[in-house]
Amino acid sequence: MSNITKKAFPVLNMHCAGCANNVEKTVKKLAGVVDASVNFATNTLSVSYEADKLTPGEIRAAVLAAGYDLIVEEALKEERQEEAQEKHYRLLKRQVIGAWIFVVPMLLFSMVLMHVPFSNEIQLILALPVMIFFGGSFYVNAWRQARLERSNMDTLVALSTSIAFLFSVFNTFFPEFWYSRGLEPHVYYEAAVVIIAFVLTGKLMEERAKGNTSTAIRKLMGLQPRVARVLREGIEEDILIDQLQTGDLVVVRPGEQIPVDGRLSEGESYVDESMISGEPIPVEKKVGDRVLAGTINQKGAFVIKASGVGSETVLARIIRMVQEAQGSKAPVQRIVDRVTGIFVPVVLCIAVLTFVIWLLVGGTDYFSHALLSAVSVLVIACPCALGLATPTALMVGIGKAASNHILIKDAVALEQMRKVDVVVLDKTGTLTEGHPTVSGWLWAQVQEEHFKNVLLAAELKSEHPLAGAIVSSLQEVEKIVPAQLESFESITGKGIKVVYQGDTYWVGSHKLLKDFSASLSDVLAEMMVQYESDGNSIVYFGRGTEVLAVVAIADQIKPTSAEAVKELKRQGIDICMLTGDGQRTALAVSGKLGIDRFVADALPDDKEEFVRELQMQGKTVAMVGDGINDSQALALADVSIAMGKGTDIAMDVAMVTLMTSDLLLLPRAFELSKQTVKLIHQNLFWAFIYNLIGIPIAAGILFPVNGLLLNPMLASAAMAFSSVSVVLNSLSLARK
């Protein structure tokens, strides 16, 4: 297999979990499809397919043949889906109002005026508009599925109401059939139309509630401007956002949303990036600085050279990531899918069995009892409650996480997070600000003129975070000019060595001292101990076997780190800190934060090995880092959590991304995962219990005990309430 493409398409005309199952089966049968899944809550098909064997148009054709539709055009896809859903909601609203206009007088005739002349005929006339105009879609959809040898909730509604209606029509025009057998001919028009009215009402409430579950993603989409102002041949021109191209010059005025990712080519301003990074203070932007789509220009006008447009912006990636996460399936969903796949056929069998048993043991009213019980079984059964249980909880949980600047990759990550019992934190950039500065220098007694030039040149070539602090101090503060080096070599996990005018110089951690057989003078050693005891990181600079300088580098602990550690402990999670710094520095930092366990002098391989050791002890490990010196440990951990501001490549590979530098997001993420998974289990429990209890009661299992026989009208109300209650329960998470 080659050229695998993964895409998500909005699905139209789905009415229940059975519909979602049918669409999924249809797409999976297509040649070239690697995998497909349908999320009923989001009305989305996620499909991986071989692009050289299949096109989106062919996928849509197959879905159309199954009675549904796809939006495959990329342009304004979300807007078209929202428009279709709004149109469907308005149609449902008209159907509900129209149905109840006829149902209310129908109930009057069936319960109060049943003895007036032509009561049955009047009820028939009132029932016809409900059956044909307002509930007609149930029969059309059920027939379409039957032709494909499939079934869904429409099948149950169509069968139950048709049986009640046709039986009533027969009794209206041929009452003698029953009179001749000494029986009273009953009509159940009210049952048929009330079932339709209740089901439509339930669907209307369900659609409204489902719409509320996608609030977070709509807010993110609202950050995308529709129009951009481009500069072409010196003339400003307004164009649609999807017409922008990489390299375009985009003009942004004060108060406007930035439409593209790019860098300032003219002007300067302050930009509000809180919607992306969560940082509340506007960030100063000058020529050459990067800006992101969706952020807001505060003051001056400027021109951006676009580097990311449309689906390539950071905002678009965030939206795509949240959508994919909301559309992913929790491990437990596989069981639910199997149940919903056979649900309707099983219910049909139970209804037939109920009818037969009542005919055999039903007594004098055997036929009416058999009919009503079979109809009640068909009506009360609800695959929608099962189908909505997991995806609605995921939508709300992952959406709430996104609104809190926490990006969760998928449902599996959410499930894994609640099992975590050890969090491993990389010190630099995670517990600390990640903006190291030189806090002290101590040079050996003999300092040659070119030493700082060599040190600057070496650190300019280094990728280590601490190198930037030395570069800033020498280049920007002391205005040192870098020397011309003859060679450069990186020593993994230790530092670097360079050659200048035939001499070998080295910069790095204390591990390099052993490599070069170098030792500290008493003065340098004493100062090094003082620096480390204050929590500073130490960088050594030497030539051959001689240590030339000790540089102390401070990286301030984040204001929220100690509180985050305390909150994680409250949740029962053990915490370990990993750092490449020495023992004294690690002890000083861990003491300030209340972390009991740490590993100092840790190389990237050591961090990976530490995570592996924890896993061998049976621990579920979450690794939190910035992806610089901890990528191996992040990859190995059960849950990988990246610290970033939405611009990191770590966002693509980590299971969870904290979009701001606030470490309090970490315990919040774990809390949200536990709440969401708990909600999924609650929803599934009640959905299963509802069907396990409701179907036997509808079949008449309590009749021998207390004479209770469930009216089909009450059964339809219970069915409508079951799926609505699942969605409302999911929405309760948004209020926590």
Language-model features and meaning:
Residues 32-53, 57, 189, 218-312, ...:
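Conserved cytosolic catalytic loops of P-type ATPases
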Residues 466, 475-588, 603:
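Signature of the cytosolic headpiece of P-type E1-E2 ATPases
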Residues 4, 21, 500-502, 542-682:
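Conserved ATP-binding TGD loop and adjacent catalytic N/P-domain core of P-type ATPases
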Residues 276, 372, 382-458, 614, ...:
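Conserved catalytic phosphorylation-site environment of P-type ATPases
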Residues 8, 80, 179, 193-254, ...:
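Juxtamembrane coupling segments of multi-pass membrane pumps/enzymes
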Residues 1-122, 219, 235, 316, ...:
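Flexible metal-binding regulatory segments at protein termini and peripheral loops
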Residues 112-115, 147, 166, 400, ...:
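Membrane-embedded alpha-helical bundles of multi-pass transporters
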Residues 91-227, 338, 441, 710:
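Transmembrane helix-loop-helix hairpins at the membrane interface
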